[in-house]
């Protein structure tokens, strides 16, 4: 079924409850979902609360309905009902969007909650079929237990593979194995009219190109096909507390960057900056002895004490889970909730002056604010990075030429009111990093979205040189912009056009 193109029509009767179901449009939508037997979370129940409470409680949005499918035909039926009634549709996998895009990034969406579709099946040839609702920890455990195989992905086990793979998929072995989307061989996608299509390099190849970097703008990916690789026998995780001060930090950062230009692909790492100081941590695909040898050219220049943890692949995954006792996360599963703001940048190498400005800002403005902020500077590129191998135009992921990824996060607990100066703090940090670059020299990672960007700013920064082609493909596969959020790709002929309102309503989007 997953390789057929078909139109799903209404099925058996069921029952559905919707938000504000007091208008003709909402009543028609409710009836459509009911007639099609689409499972729905009921408002006022613990299930509704779980599905609609965002990871980032600073940005809370109210869906019109939450569909909880267990099979692809139910996704298609729900999408058909939404299209008929002019209701925008958003997929939600693990629900870890920093800007609540899994809830639509605005009120009034039909949310397709995919976490009941989490099956992972490994074939004898090493390929895997993974449903989009599977969490990364579950994917890692299943691939390893079924055949000692692995997939390159991020390190938070609760993140859903759906959005992670759709926009990139960076993790602590990515310089060796590339991004998650680099291992995608095919996908099964529900389009705006309820049609189910199979896409790959040979079938619907333009759609396949688009979903590897901008997937949420084009349909609901129900299932991915991935190539996998033999799980490494040894992965060595490490950390170094750096005894840097405002005077020594710029030279240390520059030395680290210089080392990273030619460091082996087996090594992926980051500088982590907090009010307490700087640390260097990462992972090496190999044993402890090989890691120590690889770090020799660096350690004498940056100082600090090296601590290591050697283990197998699943021990690597557990190490980065930061104390979570269970990485094999399946439903019902809830997320930690924070009130936060994130921003970031993908950039070329930085100059000595830029690192000086970076360190000065940390030592003055950032420290004085007292916010619970953190900054990560990941190594994305380099001479031996697998991420840098493909061309910018090979997939919709547009940042193959970038060397560094920066991520800024500022948070408080949900019970606290988020301080408004946190937004300014993040923007000021990003500006210090990017002000020396011209337009097009830097970008942003769509999996670390910035809620403060306008639609146009976000699209240019997330997709860069690939945006124009994405807009053309959007016009072909989603001409009426059903799959949308405030920062998603718009169809070429409709880039300056307002989305259609719900029938019988006038909504501001």
From Swiss-Prot:
Residues 59-231 form the FAD-binding PCMH-type domain. Transmembrane segments: none annotated. It comes from the Eukaryota. It is an enzyme of class 1 (oxidoreductase). GO terms for biological process: terpenoid biosynthetic process. Pathway: Secondary metabolite biosynthesis; terpenoid biosynthesis. Glycans are attached at residues 125, 193, 281. Residues 1-21 form the signal peptide. Induction: The subglutinol cluster is highly expressed when mycelia and hyphae are transferred to fresh media for a 3 hour induction period, remaining expressed under conditions of heat shock. The cluster is repressed in cultures reaching stationary phase or in early germinating cultures, as well as under conditions of UV, salt and oxidative stress. GO terms for molecular function: FAD binding; oxidoreductase activity. Keywords: FAD, Flavoprotein, Glycoprotein, Oxidoreductase, Signal. The keyword Flavoprotein applies. Its EC number is 1.1.1.-. Its cofactor is FAD. Belongs to the oxygen-dependent FAD-linked oxidoreductase family. FAD-linked oxidoreductase; part of the gene cluster that mediates the biosynthesis of the immunosuppressants subglutinols, meroterpenoids consisting of an alpha-pyrone (4-hydroxy-5,6-dimethyl-2-pyrone) moiety attached to a decalin core fused to a five-membered cyclic ether carrying a prenylside chain. The first step of the pathway is the synthesis of the alpha-pyrone moiety by the polyketide synthase subA via condensation of one acetyl-CoA starter unit with 3 malonyl-CoA units and 2 methylations. PANTHER family: BINDING OXIDOREDUCTASE, PUTATIVE (AFU_ORTHOLOGUE AFUA_1G17690)-RELATED, FAD-BINDING PCMH-TYPE DOMAIN-CONTAINING PROTEIN. This is FAD-linked oxidoreductase subF. It comes from Metarhizium robertsii (strain ARSEF 23 / ATCC MYA-3075) (Metarhizium anisopliae (strain ARSEF 23)).
């Amino acid at each position: 079924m997953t390789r057929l193109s078909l139109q799903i029509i209404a099925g058996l009767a069921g029952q559905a409850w919707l938000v504000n179901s007091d208008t003709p449009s909402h009543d028609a939508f409710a009836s459509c979902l009911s007639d099609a037997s689409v499972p729905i979370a009921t408002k006022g129940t613990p299930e509704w609360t779980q599905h609609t409470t965002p990871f980032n409680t600073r940005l809370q949005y109210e869906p019109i309905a939450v569909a909880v499918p267990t099979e692809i035909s139910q996704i298609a039926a729900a999408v058909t009902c939404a299209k008929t009634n002019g209701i925008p549709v958003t997929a939600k996998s693990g629900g870890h969007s920093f800007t609540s895009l899994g809830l639509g990034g605005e009120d009034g969406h039909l949310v397709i909650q995919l976490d009941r579709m989490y099956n992972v099946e490994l074939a004898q040839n090493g390929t895997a079929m993974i449903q989009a609702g599977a969490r990364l920890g579950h994917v890692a455990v299943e691939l390893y237990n079924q055949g000692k195989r692995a997939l390159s992905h991020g390190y938070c086990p609760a993140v859903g593979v759906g959005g992670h793979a759709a926009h990139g998929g960076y993790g602590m072995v990515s310089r060796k194995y590339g991004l998650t989307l680099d291992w995608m061989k095919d996908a099964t996608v529900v389009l705006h009219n309820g049609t189910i299509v199979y896409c790959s390099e040979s079938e619907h190849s333009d759609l396949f190109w688009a979903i590897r970097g901008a997937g949420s703008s084009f349909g609901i990916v129900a299932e991915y096909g991935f190539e996998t690789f033999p799980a490494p026998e040894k992965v060595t995780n490490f950390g170094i507390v750096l005894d840097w001060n405002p005077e020594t930090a710029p030279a240390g950062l520059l030395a680290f960057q210089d080392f990273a230009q030619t460091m082996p692909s087996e090594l992926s790492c980051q500088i982590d900056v907090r009010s307490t100081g700087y640390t260097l941590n990462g992972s090496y695909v190999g044993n402890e002895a090989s890691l120590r040898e690889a770090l020799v050219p660096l350690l004498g220049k940056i100082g600090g004490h090296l601590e290591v943890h050697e283990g197998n692949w699943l021990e690597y995954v557990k190490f980065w889970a930061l104390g979570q006792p269970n990485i094999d996360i399946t439903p019902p599963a809830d997320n930690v909730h924070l009130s936060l703001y994130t921003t970031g940048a993908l950039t070329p190498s930085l100059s000595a002056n830029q690192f000086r400005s970076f360190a000065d800002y940390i030592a003055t403005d950032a420290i004085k604010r007292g916010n619970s902020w953190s900054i990560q500077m990941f190594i994305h590129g380099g001479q031996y990075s697998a991420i840098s191998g493909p061309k910018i135009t090979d997939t919709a992921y547009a940042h193959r030429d970038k060397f560094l990824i920066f991520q800024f996060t500022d948070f408080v607990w949900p019970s606290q009111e988020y301080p408004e100066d946190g937004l300014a703090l993040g923007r000021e940090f990003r500006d210090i990093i990017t002000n020396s670059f011209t337009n097009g020299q830097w970008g942003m990672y769509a999996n670390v979205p910035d809620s403060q960007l306008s639609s146009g700013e976000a699209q240019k920064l997330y997709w860069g040189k690939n945006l124009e082609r994405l807009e053309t493909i959007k016009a072909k596969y989603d001409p009426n912009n059903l799959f949308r959020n405030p920062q998603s790709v718009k169809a070429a002929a409709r880039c300056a056009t307002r989305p259609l309102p719900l029938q019988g309503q006038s909504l501001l989007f």
